[in-house]
UniProtKB/Swiss-Prot annotation:
Gene3D superfamilies: Winged helix-like DNA-binding domain superfamily/Winged helix DNA-binding domain. It is an enzyme of class 2 (transferase). DNA binds at residues 123, 137, 160. Its EC number is 2.1.1.63. It comes from Candida glabrata (strain ATCC 2001 / BCRC 20586 / JCM 3761 / NBRC 0622 / NRRL Y-65 / CBS 138). The active site is at residue 154. SUPFAM superfamilies: Methylated DNA-protein cysteine methyltransferase, C-terminal domain (SSF46767). The keyword Nucleus applies. Keywords: DNA damage, DNA repair, DNA-binding, Methyltransferase, Nucleus, Transferase. It catalyses: a 6-O-methyl-2'-deoxyguanosine in DNA + L-cysteinyl-[protein] = S-methyl-L-cysteinyl-[protein] + a 2'-deoxyguanosine in DNA; a 4-O-methyl-thymidine in DNA + L-cysteinyl-[protein] = a thymidine in DNA + S-methyl-L-cysteinyl-[protein]. GO terms for biological process: DNA alkylation repair; methylation. This is Methylated-DNA--protein-cysteine methyltransferase.
Length: 207
């Protein structure tokens, strides 16, 4: 059995459910949304599926961020750093690790982490970097499997023509996250949506 500490965080842009692995103090799961019951249900489903593969039972323990319980200082620090990220701040020392995903998905997520605040890249660019021929679909699937929102910044990946494409936690939230990072439509008078385009010349990240 393994303990996973969790807490809900609330910001003006959305709420989140955050899990930290007790034995490593690493962030291992973060999901976005306003419905706490649905967030917790999604987490239970994800960890139950993982449990079938790992043969480990994951024990959920809720910790309030302001709790004075012993041995939760590192947990609180991790949750506070995640909250700052969600609020649009740059945080460089948040400890996380992958509990989910395949080796290919881990490579994809590692590429996403390289995209800086205020920049975007495309599915094709990632496929080319990883040398996956015709790999945009595989990249999209890998991005959609990301279970650590914001820290693994899948909201910074767009289509080759600059349109937003989908987002696991809703396209409307993807727009808000990008605009918070000062990434706008080519015509700033237009709100970012599935039809407007981001200026890749201005915002695209090049390694």
């Amino acid at each position: 059995m393994e303990d996973l500490l969790y807490s809900f965080v609330v910001t003006d842009i959305t709420s989140a459910l955050v899990f930290v692995r007790r034995q490593t103090d690493a962030l291992v799961y973060a999901s976005l949304g306003l419905n706490k019951k649905q967030l917790l249900k999604g987490a239970r489903t994800a960890f139950n599926q993982l449990s079938k593969k790992s043969a480990i039972h994951y024990n959920f323990k809720q910790i309030e961020v302001e709790s004075e319980q012993e041995h939760v200082e590192k947990f609180q620090d991790t949750v506070n750093k995640f909250t700052k990220l969600l609020e649009g701040h740059i945080v460089k020392d948040l400890h996380y690790e992958y509990m989910f995903g395949t080796s290919l998905q881990h490579r994809i997520w590692d590429e996403l982490v390289k995209i800086p605040h205020g920049k975007v890249t495309t599915y094709k660019e990632i496929a080319d970097k990883l040398k996956i021929k015709n790999g945009s679909r595989a990249i999209g699937s890998g991005i959609g499997s990301n279970n650590i929102a914001i820290v693994i910044p899948c909201h910074r990946v767009v289509c080759s023509n600059g349109t937003l494409s989908g987002y696991k936690w809703s396209t409307s939230l993807k727009r808000k996250l990008l605009e918070r990072e000062h990434v706008y439509a080519s015509n700033k008078k237009d709100a970012l949506n599935k039809d407007t385009k981001i200026s890749l010349m201005k915002y695209k990240y090049s390694a």
